[in-house]
Amino acid sequence: MAQWDDFPDQQEDTDSCTESVKFDARSVTALLPPHPKNGPTLQERMKSYKTALITLYLIVFVVLVPIIGIVAAQLLKWETKNCTVGSVNADISPSPEGKGNGSEDEMRFREAVMERMSNMESRIQYLSDNEANLLDAKNFQNFSITTDQRFNDVLFQLNSLLSSIQEHENIIGDISKSLVGLNTTVLDLQFSIETLNGRVQENAFKQQEEMRKLEERIYNASAEIKSLDEKQVYLEQEIKGEMKLLNNITNDLRLKDWEHSQTLKNITLLQGPPGPPGEKGDRGPPGQNGIPGFPGLIGTPGLKGDRGISGLPGVRGFPGPMGKTGKPGLNGQKGQKGEKGSGSMQRQSNTVRLVGGSGPHEGRVEIFHEGQWGTVCDDRWELRGGLVVCRSLGYKGVQSVHKRAYFGKGTGPIWLNEVFCFGKESSIEECRIRQWGVRACSHDEDAGVTCTT
């Protein structure tokens, strides 16, 4: 009977074993490593923890489903056995009652048989329960071992997953730091580029202003040189006229001298006898001045005199001739790509025309302004202005420019005077113009041009 009494203790041991297997989320989370110091934000940590907990709950569910199935099968088997034993007792118990009142021996025999039967049933029940418990214990032991192995594998995978997550967090932190540094470097570089761009634009603007001033100075110098050349030509012409006049006078004097010498050669004088002395005559008139003698030697230089009063400024001279074309400058930066054209050829200008020439490529320059055609005065009229006019009319370039109404005098108003062009303008209206409508110029100074065909 001691063996039968040990059955509840074994059942308690199995219950303790089952209780030892039970675990919850807190025990599992306690096994997890502490939070990394240099990790991502709180939301990312919560997401990773939620994922780990969901995985753990799924594993626990997978482990508990077979256990519940085995326990349910054992309970069903035990109930089936109880039902069979109860049916046997029900079949045996009515037999002594059906025979009525028998002898006492039969009653004792029946009681002994019933007692033995009950003992046998209890032993059979205990053996069946013990056998079932042994089978359950073996199955549970095997299952617990498998569960422990799986749980250890899950913990190992979780630890490796957390370590990899921590490594990724460290890598992400390093990448974020490097990105912050790179962003700072890019901002500094952008600021330096903007500063350099501003300086370059400022220097370019200053250089453009200096180039304009230099071109104006060159233009003024060319005008002064042209005026000096015209003065030189005028003085040379005057000197040539004076020399021609002096040569004529010299030739006349030589001719007179030759005639006088011939006359003196033909005169002969005969000396007669001396006459009586006459009375003293009156004093005659003074004779003519003699021929000036040769200049004497140069004397020693005298002392330097005091500085005299500065004279009045002279009259502005005539504009000088046009200077030679300068060397081409450096190539500028490449401009932006222009918009797509319509495909049609460039039309000739409708505001400029050439009149009075031998063909359409030359003539007097006339401009249409305020509904009327007018001419251009030839003051400061040079090749760059003629180049702009020829290009606006569709020609390749300029051959020469003309002044002083070379193609005849025009009629109507004189619109422009002292036109200054750089040679890159598309029309003469884009050149530097002081004013429209000139009164200090006449049609004797109308400008003309000959374009290259």
Swiss-Prot record:
It is found in: Membrane. Residues 77-108 are annotated as: Spacer. SUPFAM superfamilies: SRCR-like (SSF56487). Residues 1-50 are cytoplasmic. Residues 352-452 form the SRCR domain. Residues 272-343 form the Collagen-like domain. Its main location: membrane. This is Macrophage scavenger receptor types I and II. Membrane glycoproteins implicated in the pathologic deposition of cholesterol in arterial walls during atherogenesis. Two types of receptor subunits exist. These receptors mediate the endocytosis of a diverse group of macromolecules, including modified low density lipoproteins (LDL). PROSITE patterns: SRCR_1 (PS00420), SRCR_2 (PS50287). Residues 77-453 are extracellular. GO terms for biological process: protein homotrimerization; receptor-mediated endocytosis. The chain crosses the membrane at residues 51-76.
